[in-house]
């Protein structure tokens, strides 16, 4: 045998040594006290096929087979046990190294090996306990999924999936959890039966206090059975119902009335804001069942026509209908309170979405359009979702009725009722397209193969989920909080901008770039429609990619692909590009670009200072005109590390004490966190973001 390079377990190369193989075989014989001569060893070795680039595992597998082929079963058994023990030793050593590295990491997100997450604010024993088993969960999830793929489509497709996964053409999100991804729940089962149907012991809420306490417990329970977000779009509607029960339907008309007989003499308004405080501060606490991170909690606000289109037929258990006047007041009161509260503490959740109906280039409900602009001008940070067709809405502020050709559901889970995403499988578009071009393939044909594979894999995941439900492991579905048939299987995309750059396209609003975007995303939608049935829904999302945006860039660069930045974009423009103005970015997230993104793509409009109410109102009209249906404005808030003062403005020093030791709170992806909680790679990405001066660009 001539010289070959073998691949060791850590990926490094070493020169092939026949002596090492022969010594290993001899030691295996000695371990069971069997004699062996050189001729026998040579015969065993003759069965081994060695080639350049062969892995150590491959060689050892062949040794096992050769020993059994020659009838040395006891020796083969000993060799297998020896390998297993060494494998366990290596795994323990790897975990010990990870433990040490995690303890020394700058923060929890940087220390996390598998899914860096800024929602974990502090490293401690609880977060470490959550991190250690993640590699085992990944192996288990891959085994469960590939076994199902083999049953449904054969071994070849299962191997193709693993090959694409291991070579980073695709990425399976949330492999470190057995739970399905995110859900926008209906709270009705809890309203009529408490938490007993999902394993709790609390009965249905009967008054305002039991609603507040029970709601917090219910959200914690639901979130422990999800790997992603939990949205409660009915939250304020139910809260308004219980406030009305307590203080009368017209409570909002005399909110300054004293109703507390204690020494504090609290008004209705103070009783309500105390409820806000109890719920919001409780849910923002780290949770043991979620590796010591807070529940990813989302809520929605509605304008009047949107509310009526969603909840016009809704009836409470006592036969009453939701009261819009009270809810309208309560929504505004909650937003005002929450905005002010964020100057007292770093409150990430809830992630809020304002749902507005539009017509003829503006919102229909001018009162709520004006209020939305007012809240933005006061420094509040929330998302806005705009739709121009009330008839296309089912009971979800993200989900269009399946009568329409395109379903829409954003996987952060915000705003829907009994919907969400079961699983996300992401395509690395930059690698796929570069691989095709470099190998002389039509990139659309190659992408079609990858997209088709992803749909089959997602269907396999869906079958595993149905089996778990059949075995009673998914009480959220059984109890009716989530509807299996209305949950999506999501095909994620990442690296779209980078792939376009590789092809030499200019990343701005031009026909060539638009054609590329529509061509690529249109392929995904084509297969989404092809694989959709009455029981299975697919959508496509430009994923936020907090974690994998960094990983894709790293992996692709290591393998020699064109990588223009250290973190792949999750927008249609380059986030550090200072040549695009505010309106350009709304256009690049407008109807022609997002047409095929039925799972969402949020425009994060980074601004260096807050605009006026009139300017924000104008931007709402621009968004409606361009068809940009999902967006937020992102102005970093300043947090003083010395005195703790929080200011809504983007400042270089604290206005309270003058210290320049300041941190910033901004959106890492969809949620607000201190920049110092970001992973090291994401902190670098945040520093490169371009913050536009919208004050000078937008006319009032």
Please give the residue ranges for each predicted region:
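Conserved catalytic cores of very large enzyme subunits
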Residues: 96-485, 506, 510-664
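Catalytic-loop motifs flanking and including active-site residues across diverse enzymes
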Residues: 17, 21, 231, 489-496, ...
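Contiguous, well-ordered alpha-helical segments that form the cores/surfaces of helical PPI scaffolds
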Residues: 237, 489-502, 522, 667
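Charged, amphipathic alpha-helical regulatory modules used
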Residues: 1-108, 483, 685-691
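Metallocofactor- and cofactor-centric catalytic cores in central/energy metabolism, strongly enriched
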Residues: 270-273, 502, 687-690
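Short, hydrophobic beta-strand segments
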Residues: 4, 46-50, 312-313, 498-505, ...
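Long, charge-rich boundary regions
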Residues: 656-700
């Amino acid at each position: 045998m001539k010289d070959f390079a073998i691949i060791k377990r850590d990926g490094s190369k070493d020169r092939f040594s026949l002596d090492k193989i022969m010594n290993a075989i001899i030691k295996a014989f000695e371990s069971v006290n069997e004699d062996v001569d050189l001729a026998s060893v040579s015969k065993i070795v003759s069965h081994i096929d060695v080639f350049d680039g062969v892995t150590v595992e491959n060689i050892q597998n062949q040794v096992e087979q050769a020993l059994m082929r020659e009838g040395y079963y006891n020796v083969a058994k000993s060799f297998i046990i020896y390998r297993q023990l060494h494998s366990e030793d290596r795994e323990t050593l790897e975990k010990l190294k990870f433990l040490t590295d995690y303890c020394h990491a700058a923060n929890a997100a940087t220390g996390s090996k598998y899914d860096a997450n800024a929602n974990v604010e502090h490293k401690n024993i609880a977060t470490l306990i959550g991190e250690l088993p993640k590699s085992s969960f990944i192996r288990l999830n891959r085994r469960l999924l590939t076994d199902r793929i083999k049953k449904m489509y054969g071994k070849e497709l299962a191997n193709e999936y693993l090959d694409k996964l291991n070579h980073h053409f695709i990425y399976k999100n949330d492999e470190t959890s057995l739970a399905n991804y995110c859900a926008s729940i209906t709270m009705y089962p809890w309203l009529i039966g408490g938490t007993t149907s999902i394993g709790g012991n609390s009965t249905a809420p009967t008054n305002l206090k039991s609603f507040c306490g029970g709601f917090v417990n219910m959200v914690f329970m639901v979130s422990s059975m999800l790997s992603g977000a939990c949205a409660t779009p009915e939250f304020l509607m139910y809260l308004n119902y219980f406030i009305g029960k307590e203080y009368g339907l017209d409570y909002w008309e005399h909110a300054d009335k004293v109703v507390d007989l204690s020494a504090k003499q609290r008004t209705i308004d103070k009783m309500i804001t105390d409820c806000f405080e109890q719920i919001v501060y409780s849910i923002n606490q780290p949770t043991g069942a979620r590796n010591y991170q807070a529940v990813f909690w989302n809520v929605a606000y509605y304008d009047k026509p949107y509310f009526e289109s969603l909840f016009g037929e809704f009836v409470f258990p006592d036969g009453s209908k939701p009261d819009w006047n009270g809810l309208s007041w309560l929504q505004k009161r909650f937003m005002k309170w929450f905005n002010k509260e964020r100057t007292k503490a770093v409150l990430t959740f809830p992630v809020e979405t304002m749902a507005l109906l539009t017509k003829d280039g503006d919102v229909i409900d001018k009162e709520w359009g004006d209020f939305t602009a007012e809240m933005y001008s006061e420094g509040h940070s929330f998302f806005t979702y705009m739709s121009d067709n009330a008839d296309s809405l089912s009971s979800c502020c993200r989900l269009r009725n399946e009568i329409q050709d395109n379903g829409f559901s954003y996987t952060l889970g915000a705003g829907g009722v009994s919907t969400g995403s079961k699983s996300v499988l992401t395509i690395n578009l930059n690698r796929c397209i570069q691989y095709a071009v470099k190998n002389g393939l039509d990139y659309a044909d190659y992408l079609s193969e990858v997209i088709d594979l992803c749909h089959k894999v997602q269907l396999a995941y869906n079958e595993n989920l149905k089996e778990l439900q059949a075995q009673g492991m998914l009480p959220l579905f059984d109890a009716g909080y989530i509807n299996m048939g209305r949950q999506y299987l999501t095909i994620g995309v990442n690296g779209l901008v980078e792939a376009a750059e590789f092809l030499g396209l200019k990343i701005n609003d031009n026909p060539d770039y638009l054609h590329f975007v529509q061509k690529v995303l249109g392929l995904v939608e084509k297969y989404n429609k092809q694989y959709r049935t009455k029981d299975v829904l697919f959508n496509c999302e430009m994923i936020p990619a907090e974690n994998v945006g960094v990983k894709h860039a790293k992996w692709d660069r290591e393998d020699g692909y064109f990588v223009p930045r250290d973190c792949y974009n999750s927008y249609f423009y380059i986030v550090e590009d200072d040549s695009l103005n505010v309106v350009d970015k709304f256009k690049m997230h407008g109807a022609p670009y997002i047409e095929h993104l039925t799972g969402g793509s949020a425009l994060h409009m980074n601004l260096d200072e807050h605009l006026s109410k009139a300017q924000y109102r104008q931007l709402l009209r621009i968004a409606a005109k361009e068809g940009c249906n999902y967006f937020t404005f992102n102005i970093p808030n300043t947090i003083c590390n010395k005195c703790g003062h929080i200011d809504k403005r983007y400042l270089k020093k604290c206005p309270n004490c003058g210290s320049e030791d300041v941190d910033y709170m901004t959106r890492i992806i969809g949620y607000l966190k201190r920049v110092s909680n970001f992973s090291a790679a994401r902190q670098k990405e945040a520093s490169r973001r371009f913050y536009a001066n919208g004050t000078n660009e937008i006319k009032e």
